[in-house]
Amino acid sequence: MNFSEQFTGRSEPGRKANRTSNNNTNSTTNVATVTTDDSNRPACDRCKGQKLRCIWENGSNTCRRCTRARAVCQQPRPRPFGRPRCSTKSKHHVAQNQANTKIWVSSTTQQPQENDAEMPMATSDDHDPTSFLSSTAVDLPRYLGLASFPTDPSLQIAISPPHGVHGNSFNLETGLLGNFSDAQFKNPATFYQPQGFINAANPATPAPVPVPASAPVSADGASLFEFDPDDISGDSEHSHCHWLKQLGDLNVAIYQHPLHPKPAGVSTPGVSTGFSAEQVSLSSLQIGRLLHMTSRLGRLTEEIDSADHVQPKNDGSAESDSFGGIKLAINDRSTLFVVLSCYVRLEETFAQALATVVEIRRRGPLSDDTYQLMPRLTVDGWSLECCQTMQIDFVIYICEQTLVRIRRSITSLHADM
């Protein structure tokens, strides 16, 4: 409205018509904006990050700015209303779970008593199978159920604790389990010569296995043991503890083998600290005993694996391939740890045996002891007793193949851990 219209109340017809058309156009634009704007929807991430107004069209999945920029338009997730949900576990269940994750730890200042005295306890980590070895005061034989080992007569070979290990203790440097009573060392009848091992005095005749005087005897004269050493199946109640005891016996027997490398400064009675290729003879290597323990460990591993899977993998024969492709599903990590410890010791022992035999083979002529590695090996009636070089080559091949399979098993066990 101009100056003349304000005082006269008149206006030109042309201007009034233009003003009316402009008002109609603005009203139409406002109506269209209101119908197309969806103000109930939240701003997208792009507009919210740039602190811009987000305008949504009805029936469109993208806002105006994202549509023009051809960008991805994402809406934030709606926030939950109210308080967060309370935990379903009560304090009683939490306290019970914490009590189940504790293990007994032997203290050097406090000894266990008979009148149910409490012992210091340490919490174990469920994700680390070796976390219970963080303290040097851990009573490992009692934790693994090995308080009464060695119990397997086929592996009890004059075992004696090394110097510096007393009572129920565990030496982390040597890894030797020292949980033996004085009566076992004073009574020679409690230790046996393994059945089937080669006798150094007469290789063709295996050493007999004497029966201890304290062993119970049935009516027919057969000795009765709590667990049969050759029967590794067992029932569901005692099989797991029986396997742990046999694995502990194997671990000690492998450590007592002459070819097992000994740490510096540790001297064990009856066990040499090392070998020299110029002084050692083939009769002192005890390779047959090492192969026997390896086969026994493979059978134990397969038996534990088949028990965990309910269905056995094979018939349990000693001639089966026991070292390749092991995939354990052991629920108790202590069993897996002991199995892995045995395989690691076997790897070190076979590596030492292979290096020693190769050095003897490279040295040239053999010694005058004429020890036969395989006295009964024949090919279609022809004996190989006089072919000592061929026998050594065959032993080297066996050690190489066994070492490869043991390392493959160690890799598989590490994957299970």
Curated annotation (Swiss-Prot):
Compositional bias segments (type: Basic residues): 80-94
Ranges of Polar residues composition bias in the record: 104-114
Presence of keyword Manganese: no
PROSITE patterns: ZN2_CY6_FUNGAL_1 (PS00463)
Low complexity composition bias: residue spans: 19-37
Compartments (UniProt record): Nucleus
DNA-binding region: 44-73
GO CC terms in record: nucleus
InterPro entries: Zn2-C6_fun-type_DNA-bd_sf, Zn2Cys6_DnaBD
GO molecular function, one term: DNA-binding transcription factor activity, RNA polymerase II-specific
UniProt region (Disordered), positions on chain: 1-40, 75-94, 104-128
CDD domains on file: GAL4
Location (main, coarse): nucleus
Alphabetical UniProt keywords: DNA-binding, Metal-binding, Nucleus, Transcription, Transcription regulation, Zinc
Transmembrane segments: none
Xref: SUPFAM superfamilies: Zn2/Cys6 DNA-binding domain
Keyword Oxidoreductase in annotation: no
Function: C6 finger transcription factor; part of the tra gene cluster that produces terrestric acid. The clavatol biosynthesis cluster cla and the terrestric acid cluster tra are both involved in the production of peniphenones and penilactones.
Protein name per Swiss-Prot or TrEMBL: C6 finger transcription factor traC
Native organism: Penicillium crustosum (Blue mold fungus)
